Structures are given as C-alpha cells and as structure tokens.
C-alpha cells in the first residue's frame, strides 16, 4: 500500500473513475509480480513477442497490443507431426489474458484499499495483526457460543452469473472500460464457476495463474452475500458491538453503498422486528459460515428462509434450503476449520460450609469444547500417502531420493504443524495416533531407502526421531514437569490458541 501511495496521486473522491489508464503503467505489473518498482517486468515477454526496438520502460504500446490480441478471435492450428506445437499456440492466447489479468487485479483493488484506509484511520485495531489469524476465531467462539442455543450451518450459494457479478461491481467502480475488460477476462476463463464450487483441480489452475484476481472477485461476492447481516445488525442494535466490529475487521470489505441501505430500509422496515436478536453472532471461513443465536428454533427457521429468499431475489440464485442446517449446540458437533466444536454441560461439585451444616451442590456449566477429528485426519494422511485408509503407516517412496536429515525434517515439520494447529483442542488423544503414524511412516521411508528393516532404524535413531517429532510446547512442558506421566496429563489439558496461523496448507503438498 505504501508503494501505491508514491505512484497514485489521485483524488480519493474520484479515484474509481480513472482505473483503466493505470493499466498502461508498467509499475502496476511490477507490483503484480512483486518484482519491485525498479525492474522491467515486461522486458522478457517483449522480446519473446517480437517487440524488439521499443523502449522497455514504455509499456503503453505493449499493453495495447496485448488487449487487441486478446479481443481477437484466434483459432488453434493443429500439427500432425508436432503435438507440442498445439500447446504452444493455445498457451500464447492465455498468456495475453494472463498478463492483463495480473495487472487488472492490482488496479481493481485500489478503490477498496483506499476506502479501507480512510474508514479505519485513527483506530487501534488497524495495528493489530492477530485478527488475521485463523485461531482468532476460536477465542471468540469460546467466549460467545457457550451462552447460545442454536446454530445455522450455512454453505454459501453458488454459482453467480458473470453478468450479475459485473453489475454488482458497477456499484463500486464507475469506470466503464475497466468493467468491459473484466467481462472479457471472465469469459476467457470458463472455469469461474469451478472456483466458487471449490473443486480442487480447477482451483489449483487458478491459484497458479491469477489467484489474486479471482480471490478478489470471490471475496467481493461473499461480501455481497454477507451485507444483509451488517444491515440487520445496525438496524436491530443501536449500540456498536465490539465483537461485530472485530468481525468486520477480519474481512476485506467493510462498507456498503448507501443505495443498498436505503432500498432495504424502505422494503424490509416492517419485517425487521422479526429479526431483532442482540445475541446473534456470525463467523465465516471460505465457503462455510455459522450463524448462532440464543433465540428459539422458530427464529432460526425465519432466518433460514429469509436468507434463501434474499439470495434468490438479490443474486437470482436458487439456494436449496438443505444447504442451511439448524442444529442445537448442546447435542451437535460443529465441523468448522478442521475442529469438531460443541457446547457441553460440565458438572462441577461445590461444597458450601456453614456453622452447623455443609452442603454439596452440583453446578452445570456450559463450556465450548473442541476436539481433534481423527477420521478426517487419517483420510488426509492416506491421501498424502503416509498411511492407508485404515490408518496403517506406509512408506513415502517419493521422498527416498532426499537425504536422511531432510526426510526426518519433513515428517517432523508436518507433525509439529499439526500439533501447532490443534493446540487449542481440549482433547488431544487423537494427535498421539497421528504422531505415531508419521513417526512410523518416517521409519519405513528410511528403511526403504537403505533397504533395511524398520526395527533397526528405530533402534539406531529412536531418540533423535522422538526429539524431531516433539513440538515446542511439549519440550517446554517436559522441562517444567520432569515426569513423563504428569507432563502428558498436563499437555492433554493445556489449551493454547496461536495467533500466527493465517492459512491452512494442503497436507499432501506441505513438504
């Protein structure tokens, strides 16, 4: 953002009207590729495309030609003798659109970034990086969900039509050429709907090509879906809620246009009394969201069908009611962010002593509990070829070409990261099985590499292998509690939420 301020001397009140000319500035592509502002990002592609003779710092002509070629209809030329030539011709057209989309992704974020900075000026929360952490959600759930009764488990509807997405962006960006260019880019990538559905194969293609643009569009679409919660929250609660404000800071877009507020105030003013619930809490991660309340099942059913009608009328999306499940927190485990969370009744015995008599009172306290889901973890380990579907450890043949220390470090890093992520769970017995699978898989991989037996490697590297699979908190607790039994019992009860986890990596690719 600091780099943009040095180059973008645009009036904030009119900056959304002048986005298209920024597409011809070379530093935009330098920012998109993170190559710095002094390097020439288009230097090598210019030579490859036959633009020799032009100044490599003057990119306007290059960008114009890229846009022209992207607009032109091209047909594939098939060569019978050279199948690789076909891929080259097809890749050349994708290269033009990819170059433009990478620069366009930086430009389209400018109005939202500047609006974000202006809306959060003078607030201390902008200096906090802990809200970026995934684990920052769980302390909020522990504080709030233990007092709630019901929860709506929501899957965000998909897919949205491309033209409707552009119409929604038109409310924020009044630059017509930029919107026309975005329309061309979206139709160049026919797999846009696959991004919404989170299909792994198609999503991996986008993550390698234009992750920034499509994640921006997806976040904008999700924000539009969530805008109704912000509006109803402001209408039902006159005092600004700190927890609600903290939720808003964890998203990328914070304000809704005034026209939206006016329309909903006029249309739904008579029905707002149905949804006045001061104990409503909302949490989202990726395509799944949670709406919890202290209200009755009747109120939750009203919310369910209200959301279905809202998405259908505002986005022209048919969201099936079965994508929203109503569950009671006391007898249902919530699958969210890889944890199984629920609200359990914990009974504590209190002894009251008087002058004459003593009384023993059983007090039931609601407690938010999180456990480690062992079945999904074993499924992930089996997918990554660390074990079979039954959880039996197997060797990792793909890693046998690495050195012994590198193999041990890879297995140990995965084990430590899993322990680090599930450090806030109240019951960690499942992690011991995961550690056993990874440790024995590591030993099988080493024995396969050296054509030896697993027993010999466990005897020779037993202590080193054990130290590598210890987490940092285990090492600290082992120093405080020398006895292994007391340390294990203390570690099983210890709950630590780390605020340095900002994303979840795929276990199969985390090496």
UniProtKB/Swiss-Prot annotation:
Pfam family name, one: MatK_N
InterPro entries in UniProt: Domain_X, Maturase_MatK, Maturase_MatK_N
Subcellular location: Plastid, Chloroplast
Keywords from the named record: Chloroplast, mRNA processing, Plastid, RNA-binding, tRNA processing
GO biological process terms, semicolon-separated: mRNA processing; RNA splicing; tRNA processing
Cellular compartments per GO CC: chloroplast
GO molecular function, one term: RNA binding
HAMAP family listed in its UniProt record: MatK
UniProt record similarity statement: Belongs to the intron maturase 2 family. MatK subfamily.
Function according to Swiss-Prot or TrEMBL: Usually encoded in the trnK tRNA gene intron. Probably assists in splicing its own and other chloroplast group II introns.
PANTHER family the record matches: MATURASE K
Protein name: Maturase K
